[in-house]
Amino acid sequence: MNKLLYLLSVAALCMSGPSIAAAEAETAAEAEQPRFSIKPTARLLADGAVYAPDGQGFTDGVTLSDIAVGVTAGYGKWSGRVDLGFGYFKFAMKDVYVQYKFNDRHLLRLGYFIQQFGLQAAYSKSMKPTFETPVSDSYMGATPRELGLMYNMSLPCYFMGLSATFGTIGDLSAEKVTRPQIGTLGRFVWRPVAREGAVAQVGVSAWYQSPLYKRSNEDGKGSFNFSANYPTRVAKVKMLGATLQHAGNQLLVTPELLLSYKRFALQSQYYYMNVRRHRGLPAYEAQGAYVWLHCLLLGDSSYKYAPSVAGLATPGPKTLEVVAGYDYTNGSHKDVHGGISNDVHVSFNYYINKYLLARLGWRYAMARDSQALMADFGGRHHVNIIQARIQFRF
């Protein structure tokens, strides 16, 4: 009898084995099936500022400098994003793209977004730890949103971003534009040390692009427009500015440096721009540089690293950070008086939680030999700025 029961048990196990294996295989197959996901996003920036001296465009006050709503969606290795912004009583298209992520090391993105160019490309416009993008970066147009196709590669010790760009939404919608700025660019980074608490990174980016062509341009030659406001959002006063007619192609190069150790970090870039000109006019050159020093005062005890963008990660909740920096820009060269600026600043950033942060900062910004300031300030002006920001995002 016992032998009979034993034989029946063995037979039952043998019969159930294939069904169990089939069930496990079916469960694994279901787990591997891609799923569609969708998530709303929102961002709000409330800024307040006091200026000394004030007047002539520098008016103390508060403003909602940026309101954005959007949606992100994903399906397997595919994902996309659409953001619509509203600020200063104007609607503006923000990020609009679709991307394919081959794996954790390679991705391809197509749409309207900020390309990988220089260290500033690692941080969104609203997440600059010094409130705003460096004046050098703004003046030379190093990190605008552009229509483009981008390929990114992120390896343990190397990062690379390659793009082809086809101008901005503003260029394509402007009157009399016959051809937008078209270019190619790349960012190349070497990071022999890149982990939480220790980063040593160097890199270089290069961008070569054509000018903007309009029907009104004489002899079919192109033009470039370079400008930067004083680094504050409550008052919008142009600090530097130059318009180049009879322009040829532009070359923009920026080496970068990022170092961090525990609660301290340093990041810096140098910019060099050269624009060829026609009709025997001399080439236009501009240059600039900035350096930021970071320190975590409370909360996190060391800086984290974001390998997918080759930059510092956002500090964690309940972390207080101080950032001090200096920015120099020289946009004046031969017959072009774009302006020369100096900017010194200190910012305190408190990351309350993953949805909310507060910033408080002081900066001294001065410009001279600037055609943009000629009418109101005789080409030269300085201002002290105390500003605060509450930022909400999810």
What are these regions (language model features)?
Residues 1, 7, 13-45, 302-305, ...:
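N-terminal periplasmic/intermembrane-space "pro-region" immediately following the signal or transit peptide
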Residues 3-4, 360:
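Hydrophobic alpha-helical segments, especially transmembrane helices
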Residues 13-14, 167, 273, 365:
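Single-residue recognition of alpha-helix boundary sites
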Residues 14-18, 78, 378:
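Hydrophobic alpha-helical membrane context
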Residues 29-52, 56-212, 295-301, 306-314, ...:
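Outer membrane beta-barrel
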Residues 39, 197-201, 208, 212-236:
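Glycan-binding loop/region signatures in secreted carbohydrate-active enzymes
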Residues 55-56, 219-394:
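Outer-membrane beta-barrel pore domains
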